[in-house]
Amino acid sequence: MSSHKLYFKITNEKENHNGFQYNDGLNVLKEKFNDDPTASCVAGGFYFTNSENIFEFLDHGIYLREITLPTDDPDFKMVQDKNNKWRANKIILGKKYNLNNISTFEFLISNGANIHADSDYAIRWASINGHSEVIQFLISNGADIHANNDFAIRWASIKGHLEVVQHLISKGADIHTDNDYAIRWASKNGHLEIVKFLVSSGANIYANDNCAIKWASGNGHSEVVQFLISKGADIHADNDFAIRWASIIESMCE
């Protein structure tokens, strides 16, 4: 018999962590259990959390697993770790959910997941990974798109997730935060369509001493460079930085 209380764990693609291969059903620790309640993030235990805090751990993998505990087992041991997690010497892996699926987040929210945990990490994580439908769902449930200095729009721009950028801006994300961070990094990484959309939304191409064109040039993104020039970016900024660092500019200046 196991506990009726439901916990959760996030696993990676192979569901293997620190050399231990997790399997459906009962998993038993092979090494000695670390029962020191003052120790944190140590070997000697299977880690898991509850529904309220699961969003803090989204970057640990791609699957959500339901966890129940074999509390009727006389050899079962468990301690509460720091930072909203527990560890035990035995856990039971139940249902598996994919973290890129909106239904997973609907399930978690319905089971009490805190959408604002760890400075709205859920929407920040979804923006990094380009999960547009998940983002829309999180926003509709009150997620703060401005958390951590508009982290979501900044990282969606860095990673090249156009649909996410478009949706965040439609909901009021600040494209000018941190000296127009979004267009500077979209330019650096060569995300032309995002650069175009940010400019059409009012991004400042001159921010940080024409950083966008300098970074685009330095990384060889000629189409971004050409577009920025067409919008008036200064290729001579910072003592001709763009020209000095990218030979692609020379033909444009002849």
Regions flagged by a language model, labelled:
Residues K32-Y97:
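ADP-ribosyltransferase catalytic core
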Residues T104, E133-V134, V164, E193-I194, ...:
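Conserved ankyrin/ankyrin-like repeat signature
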Residues M1-A43, T71:
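ADP-ribose/NAD+-binding catalytic cleft of ART/PARP-like enzymes
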Residues H116-W125, H146-W155, H176-W185, Y206-W215, ...:
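Ankyrin-repeat boundary/"N-cap" motif
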Residues G94-A117, W125, N129:
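Leucine-rich, hydrophobic repeat-scaffold detector
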